[in-house]
């Protein structure tokens, strides 16, 4: 039995675990990336030859996925592959000067079969400017990812000169990406002000050439540039003197609405700011762009508090927003209960966060709202209360005269319904009026209806219909109309004949 068991066991093959060589794995990944880049070059050439933008746009959609796979060796291969002709030696050497090995990359066989392969577009002396700009853009993105910002600014400046000196329509989709990374490279070196004149010139050119996506991108970059240096007046003038293209993408619209919301909030136009920020959230991607959504919700919560409204609690409990909005949740709690002490404590503890979020100025304006909320609460609880007691309950550190002026302003704004007795030194509350007997519910429903109608109209504008979808129905209606017209003419002729016979 033992011999039988051993013989059966010996028949079972022993499979050795396959050891994966890291260098070989890196080689295979680089070869696949190189093949993808060659395919993208072919698509760009096809888009240029057929004047079809969709091929170039499909290549740009793959930028984020390819961006993660880029490395020094792959970019060297694709630059040598695309600029193989001697006529492009200057451009080739310029790009290769940025692709210096840092010693951390694994060695990859540079004489692979992939490099030996050529295509007609690469072997010929002619190279489309779109392909040249695409490869240049990949090198720029790689430099930014490697945090080589000084090299990135030089690379982006040369790329901008190439784009501005060409007027080809097929370069428009690439130009919007180039504008963005050009501004980003200078922002990383804290020299964002240097690109302002270049972007203004590019905006004029894009407007004259009807480059809608490029125009939308540049407007957003200029708004970001102005707001970075707190130049709100210049940003407002830019909004007044430019028209944002309606054919821009949803992402560009989301950024545009956010910048408008920030500008209106600084200008004390909180209702307009709330409208723009709400539209920005609606236009932004729902499953991605978490950082953008957090930024918008931070500003939106402050604007709602400045409007006298309290943000919904479930906004602060969302998984993506819970940690980022925690300081703003403490502010909301302080404003809601009208506790000036809690507000000062939250402001002191989170002042650095508010400054980094660029909301510190708006948060400081909430002090009067906290006092108003506290006064509203006291006005509901007491029919009559002295000014000294109001200062004590609100933890107000000013004088009685100061609180008297604040109460007068609160009554004038319609926050509370009360009267001030200066001789007795107290606040006299009036009877509470039922809100449903006023016009407030009507205005609230009207605002909601307007929002729903706007969403409906935007959805209709965003829908696409096949041009031949209703062709059959149109032809059928035309035939019916033609038949009716012929029948009416025939009846008219018969009636005229009958009249002629009767006269005879």
From Swiss-Prot:
It comes from the Eukaryota. InterPro entries: 26S_Psome_reg_C, CSN3, PCI_dom, TPR-like_helical_dom_sf. One of its GO terms (cellular component) is proteasome regulatory particle, lid subcomplex. One of its GO terms (molecular function) is enzyme regulator activity. Residues 494-504 have a biased composition (Acidic residues). SUPFAM superfamilies: TPR-like. Acts as a regulatory subunit of the 26 proteasome which is involved in the ATP-dependent degradation of ubiquitinated proteins. Belongs to the proteasome subunit S3 family. This is 26S proteasome non-ATPase regulatory subunit 3. The lineage of its organism: Eukaryota, Amoebozoa, Evosea, Eumycetozoa, Dictyostelia.
């Amino acid at each position: 039995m033992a011999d039988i068991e051993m013989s059966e066991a010996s028949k079972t093959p022993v499979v050795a675990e396959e050891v994966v060589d890291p260098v070989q794995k890196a080689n295979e990944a680089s070869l696949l990336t190189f093949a993808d880049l060659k395919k993208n070059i072919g698509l760009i050439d096809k888009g240029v030859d057929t004047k079809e933008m969709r091929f170039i746009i499909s290549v740009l959609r793959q930028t984020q996925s390819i961006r993660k796979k880029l490395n020094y060796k792959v970019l060297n291969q694709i630059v040598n592959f695309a600029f193989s002709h001697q006529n492009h030696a200057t451009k080739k050497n310029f790009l290769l000067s940025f692709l210096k090995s840092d010693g951390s990359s694994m060695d990859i066989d540079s004489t692979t079969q992939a490099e030996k392969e050529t295509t007609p577009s690469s072997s010929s002396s002619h190279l489309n400017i779109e392909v040249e700009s695409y490869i240049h853009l990949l090198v720029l993105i790689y430099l930014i990812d490697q945090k080589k910002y000084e090299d990135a600014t030089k690379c982006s400046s040369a790329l901008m000169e190439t784009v501005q000196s060409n007027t080809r329509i097929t370069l428009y989709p690439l130009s919007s990406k180039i504008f963005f990374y050009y501004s980003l490279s200078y922002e990383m070196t804290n020299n964002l002000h240097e690109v302002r004149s270049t972007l203004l010139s590019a905006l004029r050119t894009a407007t004259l050439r009807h480059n809608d996506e490029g125009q939308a991108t540049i407007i957003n970059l200029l708004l970001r540039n102005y707001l970075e240096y707190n130049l709100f007046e210049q940003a407002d003038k830019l909004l007044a003197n430019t028209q944002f293209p309606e054919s821009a993408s949803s992402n560009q619209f989301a950024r545009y609405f956010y910048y408008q919301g920030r500008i209106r909030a600084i200008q004390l136009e909180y209702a307009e700011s709330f409208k723009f920020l709400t539209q920005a959230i609606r236009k932004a991607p729902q499953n991605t762009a978490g950082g953008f959504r957090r930024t918008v919700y931070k500003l939106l919560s402050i604007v709602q508090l400045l409007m006298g409204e309290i943000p919904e609690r479930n906004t602060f409990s969302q998984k993506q927003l819970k940690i980022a909005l925690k300081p703003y949740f403490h502010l909301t709690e302080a404003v809601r209960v009208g506790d000036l002490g809690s507000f000062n404590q939250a402001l002191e503890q989170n002042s650095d966060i508010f400054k980094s979020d660029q909301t510190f100025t708006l948060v400081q304006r909430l002090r009067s709202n906290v006092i108003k909320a506290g006064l509203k609460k006291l006005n509901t609880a007491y029919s009559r209360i002295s000014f000294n007691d109001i200062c004590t309950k609100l933890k107000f550190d000013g004088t009685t005269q100061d609180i008297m002026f604040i109460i007068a302003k609160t009554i004038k704004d319609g926050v509370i319904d009360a009267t001030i007795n200066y001789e007795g030194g107290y606040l006299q509350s009036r009877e509470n009026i039922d809100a449903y007997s006023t016009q407030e519910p009507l205005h609230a429903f009207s605002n909601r209806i307007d929002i729903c109608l706007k969403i409906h109209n935007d959805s209709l504008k965003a829908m696409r219909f096949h041009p031949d979808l209703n062709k059959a129905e149109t032809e059928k209606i035309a035939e019916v109309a033609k038949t009716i017209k012929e029948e009416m003419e025939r009846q008219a002729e018969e009636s005229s004949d009958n009249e002629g016979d009767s006269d005879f």
